[in-house]
Amino acid sequence: MVLASVTCTAPVNIAVIKYWGKRDENIILPLNSSLSGTLHQDDLKTTTTIVASEDYTEDELYLNGKKEDINAVRYQNVLKMIRSRATKLMDKKHCVHIASINNFPTAAGLASSASGYCCLVFTLAQMYGVDGDISGIARLGSGSACRSMYGGFVKWEMGTKDDGSDSIAVQVQPESHWPDMNIIVLVVNDKKKETSSTDGMQKSAATSVMMKERCAVTVPNRMRDIEEAINKKDFQTFGDITMKDSDDFHEVCATTTPPIYYLNDTSRYIMNLIHRYNKLSGSIKCAYTFDAGPNACIYLPAESTTEVLSLFMKHFPGDDMQTYYRGPKENIPSIENFVPSEKLASLYTPDTTFVNSLKYILHTKVGPGPQILSESESLIDNTTGLPKQLN
């Protein structure tokens, strides 16, 4: 007999102040605080259904239709913590089946672990009636997952306590505060990265000469300044800090022993193009940030989007705009027909070396945190206990 069924969604977030390095690997406590923007779930999200039933004999987990090992340490840490704080379904004998899907390809290199663990924890919390902060539980699955617990702009406070109780996410401003903040993601064609984020963090923390000053001085100052910029909707300061922190993060990786390089030639071409565009424009009109991979995430105000998208389309043209440009389709005519100003004309002569360097261009905006869906949107067949896509 089914005792409860809950379906929720959770967003991806893109950090502008990077999290890199842990002071505790087991409960995922970071060496520095970080800050991110939450991307809108109309474009990127994880959906998770959890069903509790007297008929289930064990907990089961399915990701994108494939059964996963739910006994993995991070899943178990999350389940144990949620169940220890339960106010509903207190009988521990009841097992759950979990089905989770992403509406974006994992191969895109976007942070699916953040939305995935956030969605898992948020959905479990609804089912078990967990009160209070749950971002610290999401952190046990994936550090950056705690920042997906809220919409808008979110900081993950590193905390100082050994038990991690003060290492939680806090909303800086909701998505309604800066509604014209847009994000463009340039998804780069690239092979699987050679060094995972987990391994990279450990090596950088142990060997990079930049880590000490970054954690003690650079990041605390930037956290203060970028939070103030967000509060004031000061894009010049926001953009400047965002690009500098991305550059510093990749310099930390480059000064790691052995050096780690997540960016490729396409990434560097994009960085140079954005700096040239901002210089000719006379102000910062868009700002790049790169995580541990070659994809460019670009923050920009709504007023700059058509101009910037037309520039990217010129340098990285797609065969079919309907599939290549993953954003509001009504924007396509204005992007295709955009005529640059005379002072920007020199930018519209692309290096043909990079013409086929992108898989696609995603255009979204800052959006809300996790959402609860109706029973009709469940991913699990209550009769079989399996994901509907497997029936």
From Swiss-Prot:
Keyword Lipid metabolism assigned: yes
What pathway or pathways are given for this protein in its record? Steroid biosynthesis; cholesterol biosynthesis
Task: For this UniProt record, give its keywords in alphabetical order, as a comma-separated list.
Answer: ATP-binding, Cholesterol biosynthesis, Cholesterol metabolism, Cytoplasm, Lipid biosynthesis, Lipid metabolism, Lyase, Nucleotide-binding, Steroid biosynthesis, Steroid metabolism, Sterol biosynthesis, Sterol metabolism
**Which enzyme class?**
lyase
Q: Where in the cell is it found?
A: Cytoplasm
Q: Which gene encodes it?
A: mvd
Q: What is the lineage of its organism?
A: Eukaryota, Amoebozoa, Evosea, Eumycetozoa, Dictyostelia
The protein's Enzyme Commission number: 4.1.1.33
Physiological role: Catalyzes the ATP dependent decarboxylation of (R)-5-diphosphomevalonate to form isopentenyl diphosphate (IPP). Functions in the mevalonate (MVA) pathway leading to isopentenyl diphosphate (IPP), a key precursor for the biosynthesis of isoprenoids and sterol synthesis.
Name of this chain's protein: Diphosphomevalonate decarboxylase
